[in-house]
Amino acid sequence: MSTAIRSGRQSNWGSFCDWVTNTNNRIYVGWFGVLMIPCLLAATICFIIAFVAAPPVDIDGIREPVAGSLIYGNNIISGAVVPSSNAIGLHFYPIWEAASLDEWLYNGGPFQLVVFHFLIGISAYMGRQWELSYRLGMRPWICVAYSAPLSAAFAVFLVYPFGQGSFSDAMPLGISGTFNYMLVFQAEHNILMHPFHMLGVAGVFGGSLFSAMHGSLVTSSLVRETTESESQNYGYKFGQEEETYNIVAAHGYFGRLIFQYASFNNSRSLHFFLGAWPVIGIWFTSMGISTMAFNLNGFNFNQSILDGQGRVVSTWADVLNRAGLGMEVMHERNAHNFPLDLAAAESTPVALQAPAIG
């Protein structure tokens, strides 16, 4: 009896699936990578072209275009991809929705193309982190940590425009555009007096401090494996089982420098703390941006202290308020959009008596 054996050739689709999910590839692709790669490529290519050559954009919707590209006179610092026009509002504005390419460019269509593809791409990047961790049998905390900057991007590019009613209020894609966004945000929402922003500052600056402290402590307590004439980095071999630094010495040093319980004696809890502190801080900042997007602003302590005769005793809150009003006036280039808090409030005299002339 003879048996016919068919050669089991794998289909092209099967080969593609194996390649996508193969953890031995030099760079892991993954199913999230199939979505991530084209989205980030589209966002990057459009950003570069728009940053270099996009025509001016009517960001305020009042026929006063703002130039952001390099060939229109900007440099690397002042250049930006200008947000889509206030005339577009929150409408989805792909190329096919415009009457012509010139109209699409004039109304800031490239900004939406870049931002939407970018947000999808970085979300897929987080999914790819989870996917690779899952396939390697690792715990999922890498993608959880990455969710902090991801949430910040969604807050400034999506949630804030939704709350304000127009993508023209989103953060411009450029260096000075980012600073302008921050100044206007302070002027309109008093973010410096918002508790969630304070927690975010503590997270970022505290994370930097803890990172520097940890790195310096470890580097200062390395187990000597080299001579004075060799680099200390040669004392570590990738994959070695022995500890490369003396955690007991580091713990003893820091415990005596501050006090005993300020120093971790468990390497795992230490590194969890180093990861959790800045992540939680940035989460709070993202939540703060998202709440202020709907005008739930920072605390207002303006003119909250009065003397016995009812006169205002100025505090730092009043200094912030005056600075914010000044920034808001400079930001609003058109008179019909004059800041409501200036138009409705009583005028504050800047001088008690006019100087005599002549």
UniProtKB/Swiss-Prot annotation:
Domain of life: Bacteria
Keyword Transmembrane helix: yes
GO CC terms: photosystem II; plasma membrane-derived thylakoid membrane
GO molecular function: chlorophyll binding; electron transporter, transferring electrons within the cyclic electron transport pathway of photosynthesis activity; iron ion binding; oxidoreductase activity, acting on diphenols and related substances as donors, oxygen as acceptor; oxygen evolving activity
Recorded catalytic activity of this chain's protein: 2 a plastoquinone + 4 hnu + 2 H2O = 2 a plastoquinol + O2
Record site: Stabilizes free radical intermediate: 189
Site for Tyrosine radical intermediate, residues: 160
Disulfide links within the chain: none
Binding of a quinone, residues: 214, 263-264
Alphabetically ordered keywords of this record: Calcium, Chlorophyll, Chromophore, Electron transport, Herbicide resistance, Iron, Magnesium, Manganese, Membrane, Metal-binding, Oxidoreductase, Photosynthesis, Photosystem II, Thylakoid, Transmembrane, Transmembrane helix, Transport
Annotated binding of [CaMn4O5] cluster, by residue: 169, 188, 331-332, 341, 343
Keyword Transmembrane in annotation: yes
Positions annotated to bind chlorophyll a PD1: 197
Entry's EC annotation: 1.10.3.9
Annotated site residue numbers, Cleavage: 343-344
Family affiliation: Belongs to the reaction center PufL/M/PsbA/D family.
Assembly notes: PSII is composed of 1 copy each of membrane proteins PsbA, PsbB, PsbC, PsbD, PsbE, PsbF, PsbH, PsbI, PsbJ, PsbK, PsbL, PsbM, PsbT, PsbX, PsbY, PsbZ, Psb30/Ycf12, peripheral proteins PsbO, CyanoQ (PsbQ), PsbU, PsbV and a large number of cofactors. It forms dimeric complexes.
HAMAP family in the record: PSII_PsbA_D1
Family annotation (NCBIfam families): psbA
Protein name: Photosystem II protein D1 1
Organism: Synechococcus sp. (strain CC9902)
Upper lineage: Bacteria, Bacillati, Cyanobacteriota, Cyanophyceae, Synechococcales
Gene (name only): psbA1
